[in-house]
């Protein structure tokens, strides 16, 4: 499993040092970094990372308030938050927000490794607790529908709803958001190539270069389905496809 990690740090040198440490780990995919709290909130919603290394003292909204927003307003209880700060005084608040770790700057490579081990242990525990299901229950406007995830080609966010496209060309619409659907399908080979799409990797027919490092992909049996793959998501998709087909 690749771990998608985002850094929020306003000091360039500290940000680059942390990026360097993360790049030495072979199971990490680095999302774009944020330099302040508002930028982090925007990037978080777009890239949906597993882990955030979060500086506390940043311009504008500070790291503690950002974490509270993610936990409460976005109702993301699973995101792993690692606070990085030069101050010991925020330990109690970090505990209340259920941070996985609290790194005091400057921290050593050995201390960083301890944090990474905690991240992996937390993720593996969540993975064990999440059973794979054979069927998926989707709430439609007036009924509940039981579907076979293997028959889903892709799902696309359209406004406040998500349209699920089956390889039979049937389409259903649900008010479940794309992140919820992704979590329900965690035991199946689905990948988020773009903030507005979720695709079944077993149903990908072809992937073609587009521009600026981005790609387009086509789902087999759904000829009209050209789905964008963002530049930042492309490497993760190729890594995931290798894992599925080997």
UniProtKB/Swiss-Prot annotation:
Major localization listed first in the record, in broad terms: cytoplasm
Limits of the Response regulatory domain: 4-120
Statement: the UniProt record of this protein carries the keyword Transcription: yes
This protein's record includes keyword Aminoacyl-tRNA synthetase: no
Residues recorded as bearing 4-aspartylphosphate in the entry: 55
InterPro entries: CheY-like_superfamily (IPR011006), LytR-like (IPR046947), LytTR_DNA-bd_dom (IPR007492), Sig_transdc_resp-reg_receiver (IPR001789)
Processing and modification events after translation: Phosphorylated by LytS.
Domain HTH LytTR-type residue range list: 136-243
GO molecular function terms listed in the Swiss-Prot or TrEMBL record: DNA binding; phosphorelay response regulator activity
The entry's keywords: Cytoplasm, DNA-binding, Phosphoprotein, Transcription, Transcription regulation, Two-component regulatory system
Pfam family, one: Response_reg
Coiled coil: none
Cellular compartment(s): Cytoplasm
Any one cellular-component term (Gene Ontology): cytoplasm
Function: Member of the two-component regulatory system LytS/LytT that probably regulates genes involved in cell wall metabolism.
Entries under PANTHER family matching the protein: STAGE 0 SPORULATION PROTEIN A HOMOLOG, TRANSCRIPTIONAL REGULATOR-RELATED
Record's protein name: Sensory transduction protein LytT
Organism: Oceanobacillus iheyensis (strain DSM 14371 / CIP 107618 / JCM 11309 / KCTC 3954 / HTE831)
Taxonomic placement: Bacteria, Bacillati, Bacillota, Bacilli, Bacillales
